[in-house]
């Protein structure tokens, strides 16, 4: 679940499309020490799962269905993207509850 409140504006580092899965890499100012593998991050409102991270960026796999149903497949290198990490039970609810699932 997400609040819909943007935490950071990242920059698309790379979008590799090929085969059954695409990979999206984003440069971000989010603290890398707070990220974990498998964490959910909303990229332009789309819930993605972190598959790797480090050096100020993270990578997530993107399914063909997600590319077809969202604007993620039309992004180009350097595009600015809105980022939000998933809501924790201890967080304040300053926005609205949204899921981000495709």
Model-assigned labels for residue ranges:
Residues 1-102:
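Conserved loop->alpha-helix
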């Amino acid at each position: 679940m997400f609040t819909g409140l943007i935490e950071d504006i990242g920059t698309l580092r790379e979008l590799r499309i090929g085969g059954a899965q695409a990979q999206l890499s984003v440069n971000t100012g989010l603290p890398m020490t707070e990220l974990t593998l498998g964490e959910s991050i909303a990229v332009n409102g789309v819930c993605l799962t972190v598959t790797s991270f480090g050096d100020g960026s993270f990578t997530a796999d993107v399914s063909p269905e997600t590319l077809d149903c969202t604007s993620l497949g039309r992004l180009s290198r350097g595009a600015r993207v809105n980022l939000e990490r998933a809501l924790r039970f201890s967080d304040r609810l300053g926005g609205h509850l949204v899921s981000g699932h495709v």
